[in-house]
């Protein structure tokens, strides 16, 4: 691993780290405001596929978070980029609220399958259509493969089990574009003019947020909010650089120990 350099960027997960549905993590807005005063770039990286970037931005602004829409990098964006690179016509297995981020793509007579979190579309008919397309040679593009995510009433199935089911049934492997893929983190850093060794990631998912970031060369800070479950930090190797109670505590650590100022 390359030597650590001066911290230049902080990547922050959204759902489970800054907010859970329409409720902010206590103290998160104030902590973000303090981080904004430090000499680091801030970017928000998310696997959220339930809604388009614009809706997500409006939700966060409604919770009084200080951010700009262009600071949000989503796995939907990464998926669209790959679809355009491959010049394919996707069957979009995403919620209707996320379709805005795919506006302009040709989707008639699909020859590829793009799957995200789509509870309203995870039925036999749609899954079987995807199954048949893949058997006919269509590539399977997974926006991400999270096992589950946090809702107010508990944990809920993520897209991962459905992606894995299609992989199993068709004896193929999906191309995954979201966290924890190394390429996702590198793409998120690209316009920040910094290397992974100059960045830290904060998130509630040990595998996808912290493990993925550290595999890309970043530091990873795991927070015990959102989908975190006891002993999650022991599920990745190397373990998180730091595990702390919540986002405000992670910001305190960054200001005190990685930047040396509060």
UniProtKB/Swiss-Prot annotation:
Residues annotated as binding Mg(2+): 13, 15, 204
GO terms for cellular component: cytoplasm
Molecular function terms, GO-annotated: metal ion binding; phosphatase activity
Cofactor(s) of this protein: Mg(2+)
InterPro entries recorded: HAD-like_sf (IPR036412), HAD-SF_hydro_IIA (IPR006357), HAD_sf (IPR023214), LHPP/HDHD2 (IPR006355)
Entry keywords, A to Z: Magnesium, Metal-binding
UniProt entry tagged with the keyword Metal-binding: yes
Residues that, per the record, bind substrate: 13-15, 46-47, 179
Pfam families on file: Hydrolase_6, Hydrolase_like
Cofactor note: Binds 1 Mg(2+) ion per subunit.
CDD domains from the UniProt entry: HAD_PPase (cd07509)
Similarity section: Belongs to the HAD-like hydrolase superfamily.
Identification of the protein by name: Haloacid dehalogenase-like hydrolase domain-containing protein 2
Species of origin: Danio rerio (Zebrafish)
